[in-house]
Amino acid sequence: MSRRIIFIGAAGEMCRLAIERFAKAKGDWELVLCDIRPELLSNLVEKLPQGLATTQHLDLYDKQKLQAVVNGADLVVLGAGPYIRTSAPVIEACLEAKVPYLDFDDDVESTEHALSLHEKAKEAGIPIYVGCGASPGMANVLVVDAANELDTVENIDCCWMVGDERPGIGRAVLEHFLHITAGDCLTWENGKRVNHETFVETGTAPMGGGLGEILMYETAHPEPVTLPRKYPTAQRIRCLGGLHPAPFNGLGRGVGLAVHHGEMTVKEGVDFLEDLLNNKLGSAKGWKAAISGMIGQVKRKESSFSAMVEFLTKSAIGKTYPYKGGLLARVYGTKNGRPAGAIRRTVKSGEDSYLMRDMAAITGTACAAFMVLALDETGKRSGTFAPEDWAEPEAFYTALERVGTPRAEIVESVL
């Protein structure tokens, strides 16, 4: 009998990639692709094997319709963001229907809400799998892989870098970016949970994908919230992230601060970023914030004036940068009684990469691999789980291969 898998928010770029790549895994699946605009899914259905997928209109805030859709499913995958608004109603419906749930949530607040439902999920006899994307997601698995090389764990850096994807990034992604560039940042320092200001502390790491040693920013992400549950004796756990080229970070910080301080609304901030990504002029209010952010970045020596001028000049004539991105996990601790470290990172990025061609590719492919694992392990666990709680590294890497990823692209160790 076919196993019925529901995708909610299926028309989103990352979810589309997850569907395409999951379809490469062998299995008797029935895919139901739900979206508030199902007409956007027709070309996706045509790409899939005939009869594999059907489409359905769904407003996830229509509680009765949502419940009817998820009832009887073997797995529900939420791809609609921002998760701070979308995850709670879908998880509630899955608990009611007693069906497994999986998402690629990258917001702290909604991740913590899902974790608070651990006992309810156990009572319902279902798993709630959160953060099953790139970062969080594959990044957490890389941490476990690196940590397994050591005897003790003291410091963990989860690192992500996203390249130039102009034109065209979804509004939910842009809203998330503004959310992590200004405001509070829950993190783990001196062996306890503390609050920092996001996008202030910096660090560098030897990223793959052609990036090399590059500066990134501490970001408000779920990894420092979930990983201490597995590594409670660690002294420092942080998430470092950023965009390439570097001036994108100053621009985002400036607009994020303007939104955080009430000088722009969230909609105005997202509208401005969307205009820039699509080579439109953007608002004067947005440019004031963006320039302020980039100048501040130069003054702090986080980037150079020449890099800012080059970025603005290229942007003015519609030129973009070659895509460079990646994930990296760096763990310090001890081995055989001596200080030691271990690094795991993705290998390549850009147009000729399957896994790290862009943000949608890495997130969607990782999500597809987590889905394969979750379906392979149906009935094995109940409760709420972050990736480090259940996805064994080698099993995850094999799942990435099952959804089409060349083994040589998946992971490498760095001395």
Give residue ranges: language-model regions:
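Conserved glycine-rich Rossmann-like NAD(P)H-binding loop of the short-chain dehydrogenase/reductase
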Residues: 27-37
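Rossmann-fold cofactor-recognition segment
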Residues: 48-62
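N-terminal Rossmann NAD(P)H-binding glycine-rich loop of SDR-like oxidoreductase domains
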Residues: 7-21
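Conserved Rossmann-fold cofactor-binding substructure of NAD(P)-dependent oxidoreductases
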Residues: 58-72, 82
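Rossmann-fold NAD(P)-binding glycine/threonine-rich loop
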Residues: 105-126
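Helix N-cap at the beta1-alpha1 junction of Rossmann-like dinucleotide-binding domains, i.e.
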Residues: 12, 37-39, 108
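C-terminal catalytic/substrate-binding lobe primarily of soluble NAD(P)-dependent oxidoreductases
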Residues: 2, 149-415
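ADP-ribose/adenylate-binding Rossmann-like module
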Residues: 82, 93-111
